[in-house]
């Protein structure tokens, strides 16, 4: 049910961005002049087609690596290697929010093409990012609390219906259960972690998909080869690293295979689909139109708030504060190095992307 609800949210966001932006971009006028020097639609289109396949491959491999890596004991969840990889992914997601997305939101909402209105009189990008982070916290805690309350009621009803003579044997037997794929079939401690990971993975995917859609449409709408060419490798690595971060969270959530494939496909296809939409609207799309700037800025700011919260609270803090990590200096050092490496590499990509 949760995956189906997330699917509807993703589809709705895609339709809003794909239909609302181009419909208003052509109608709006702006004093900002558009430079036509270097425009070559044919060459740009060839580069966009290459970008679709490169980004699709990079996204798919990145999202699939954590799941496929589960076949190898060294990189299964809670191992030292997995924790280091997850720290690297947390750095990638944090840099995505703070270095890639949030500055773009401020730039869009402070553009000289936004004449009139409240956009230049108040830092809306920062406020929207803050509200988005707080909203993510609320969704995170409310969803987790709901699952816990529902499970507590189910257990209370099961205990009430069970004969008194069987309670002791049932209690002893329950401690021998192994962790399963279902939330209802795991031991209490593991169940709490599993619920948290499932909420984390779905909220994180929401923020990643919003950002992926926007960058895909921006690339697809450009007719300048000089702009598109460096974005092809930059966005391929960008999506690859993001895929590793998202894939690691999905692995820990222990979804069924169908749900894992669905979430991975949504992530992998969003940017290529955004490029296709951008190609379709390139003749009417004006990136400097007030409506396009406002919609892009608000969506980018909201996505930044989600990703920054998820990276700091649900990915990095959760693992760095574990007793296992605190007691082992080498593991702590490895995770810190991985964190800095992930954040540094993703920040470097901002030079081209």
Swiss-Prot record:
Residues 1-27 form the signal peptide. It is found in: Cell membrane. Induction: By zinc deficiency in roots and shoots. One of its GO terms (cellular component) is plasma membrane. GO terms for biological process: zinc ion transmembrane transport; zinc ion transport. Disruption phenotype: No visible phenotype, but increased tolerance to an excess of zinc. The chain crosses the membrane at residues 49-69, 87-107, 122-142, 199-219, 231-251, 261-281, 293-313, 333-353. It is a multi-pass membrane protein. Zinc transporter that mediates zinc uptake from the rhizosphere and may be responsible for the translocation of zinc within the plant. Plants overexpressing ZIP5 show decreased zinc concentration in shoots, increased concentration in roots, and are sensitive to an excess of zinc. This is Zinc transporter 5. It comes from Oryza sativa subsp. japonica.
């Amino acid at each position: 049910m949760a995956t189906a609800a997330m699917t509807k949210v993703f589809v709705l966001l895609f339709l809003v961005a794909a239909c609302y932006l181009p419909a208003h971009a052509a109608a709006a006028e702006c004093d900002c002049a558009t430079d036509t020097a270097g425009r070559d639609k044919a060459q740009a289109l060839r580069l966009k087609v290459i970008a679709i396949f490169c980004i699709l491959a990079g996204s798919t491999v990145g999202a699939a690596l954590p799941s496929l890596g589960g076949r190898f004991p060294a990189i299964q969840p809670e191992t030292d290697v997995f924790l280091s990889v997850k720290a690297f992914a947390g750095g990638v997601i944090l840099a995505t929010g703070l270095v890639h997305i949030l500055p773009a939101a401020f730039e869009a909402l402070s553009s000289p093409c936004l004449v009139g209105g409240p956009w230049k009189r108040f830092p809306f990008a920062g406020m929207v990012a803050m509200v988005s982070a707080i909203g993510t916290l609320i969704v995170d805690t409310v969803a987790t609390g709901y699952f816990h309350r529902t499970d507590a009621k189910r257990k209370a009803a099961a205990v009430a219906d069970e004969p008194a003579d069987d309670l002791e044997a049932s209690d002893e037997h329950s401690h021998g259960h192994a962790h399963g794929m279902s939330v209802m079939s795991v031991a209490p401690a593991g169940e709490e972690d599993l619920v948290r990971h499932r909420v984390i993975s779905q909220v994180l995917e929401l923020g990643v998909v919003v950002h992926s859609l926007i960058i895909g449409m921006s690339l697809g709408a450009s007719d300048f080869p000089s702009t598109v060419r460096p974005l092809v490798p930059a966005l391929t690595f960008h999506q690859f690293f993001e895929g590793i971060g998202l894939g690691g969270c999905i692995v820990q959530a222990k979804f069924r295979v169908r749900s894992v494939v669905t979430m991975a496909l949504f992530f992998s296809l969003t940017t290529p689909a955004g490029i296709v939409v951008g190609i379709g609207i390139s003749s009417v799309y004006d990136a400097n139109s007030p409506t396009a700037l406002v919609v892009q800025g608000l969506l980018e700011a909201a996505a930044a708030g989600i990703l920054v919260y998820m990276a700091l609270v649900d990915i990095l803090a959760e693992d760095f504060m574990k007793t296992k990590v605190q007691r082992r200096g080498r593991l702590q050092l490895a995770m810190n190095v991985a964190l800095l490496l992930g954040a540094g590499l993703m920040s470097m990509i901002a030079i081209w992307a």
